[in-house]
Design a protein with these regions (language model features):
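Preference for long, amphipathic alpha-helical scaffolds in soluble/luminal domains
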Residues: 1-344
């Protein structure tokens, strides 16, 4: 139980939206609306996965495993919250729903979809419908197209991919071609990097700006377009491939903006995350909603190491403090057997 009134909590609140990852935010906000309006799921075709349940799903009551005192606490808090929900004044609920609606609309992202990820798009499509938007309204129509673009129909079967990842594929393909050719600049590599250069996110809104309002942009998203949520890992890879060309007249400004943005996004512990800074509020992974254990976007050794590698290539004198803090983080994160955990 997470009521839509969460949208009204101040930034200092332990449950403020900014304390979870971007993918969690974009999935949760429309879900707040759907749960607060008590929307019933529609399943006219009767699709189900009953064979996966040892207890019939309609009889199952305890979906959330509890393994720690904190999980016990949040499960109790969940029960208390449900019992008090009817006491929430309607004017507060309406205000919270309006704020959630505005949050969604700002991030709709056209036909690329909110967050450019399938789960968020589906929730948004349904939430907008419950808020009175017709299927042919541009907000819903664009969202539906974003969903349909991720569905692959094979006639007797269909599959859905969670997102598209052309920036990642293009920069990794470019790096592979550079390695194979023994040179950083070939026509194929140049074509890919020029395509990428036009997609660098330098201006405009982004959730990362909530904590870095004065930091100039310079990242790339994972997908075709996802300006609110550029990806630090992708940004390092693109800048690396651009640097390898040796053509700093063409790509130098993009590389500089990318590295400056990456440094500005360093977390307080010295590490680098995928999309955010200091998104390491581990207690939130104990709430019942976070049964998958991936609610957060904390710094990780693998992303930090790749950004460090880029900094080593660029050899900029001003990056020394960043490098020292990142190296200290990497050393602290080493496992007892000498390895490092790789999330991404």
């Amino acid at each position: 139980f997470i009521p839509v009134e969460v949208m009204l909590m101040p930034e200092a609140s332990p449950f403020h939206l900014s304390k979870v990852s971007y993918w969690s935010r974009t999935v949760m906000v429309p879900l707040f609306i759907l749960t607060s309006l008590r929307v019933m799921a529609k399943n006219p075709a009767g699709v189900n996965v009953r064979e996966l349940f040892t207890v019939p799903p309609e009889q199952q009551r305890d979906f959330v495993p509890v393994a720690s005192p904190l999980q016990h606490f949040f499960k109790g808090l969940d029960a208390v919250g449900r019992s008090f929900e009817p006491l929430i004044p309607q004017f507060i609920r309406k205000r919270a729903i309006k704020k959630a609606e505005a949050w969604i609309i700002e991030r709709l992202n056209g036909t690329d979809g909110i967050g450019a990820i399938f789960p968020a798009m589906v929730n948004v499509y349904e939430a907008l419908g419950e808020l009175g938007y017709s299927p042919d309204h541009p907000y819903r129509a664009d969202t539906r197209k974003a969903i349909d673009d991720l569905i692959f129909d094979h006639g007797d079967a269909a599959n859905v991919q969670p997102c598209a990842w052309p920036v990642w594929d293009t920069c990794l393909g470019g790096l592979a071609l550079q390695e194979a050719a023994g040179t950083g600049d070939t026509p194929a590599v140049r074509a890919g990097l020029d395509w990428l250069a036009a997609r660098q996110v330098c201006d405009g809104p982004g959730d990362w700006r909530d904590f870095h309002p004065d930091l100039p942009g310079g990242g790339w998203p994972f997908q075709y377009a996802n300006d609110h949520y550029p990806d630090l890992d992708d940004t390092a890879a693109v800048a690396w491939a651009m640097y390898n060309t040796g053509d700093h007249a063409t790509y130098g400004r993009a590389i500089t903006r990318a590295m400056d943005w990456l440094i500005g996004m360093q977390s307080k512990n010295g590490g680098i995350a995928a999309f955010d800074s200091d998104n390491n509020h581990e207690y939130l992974n104990a709430i019942p909603f976070a049964d998958h254990g991936a609610l957060l976007d904390p710094p990780t050794a693998d992303v930090t190491a790749r950004v460090l590698a880029l900094a080593g290539r660029l050899r900029r004198a001003q990056d020394g403090p960043f490098i020292r803090r990142a190296l200290a983080y990497i050393k602290r994160e080493q496992e007892a057997d000498g390895s490092w955990f790789g999330r991404w």
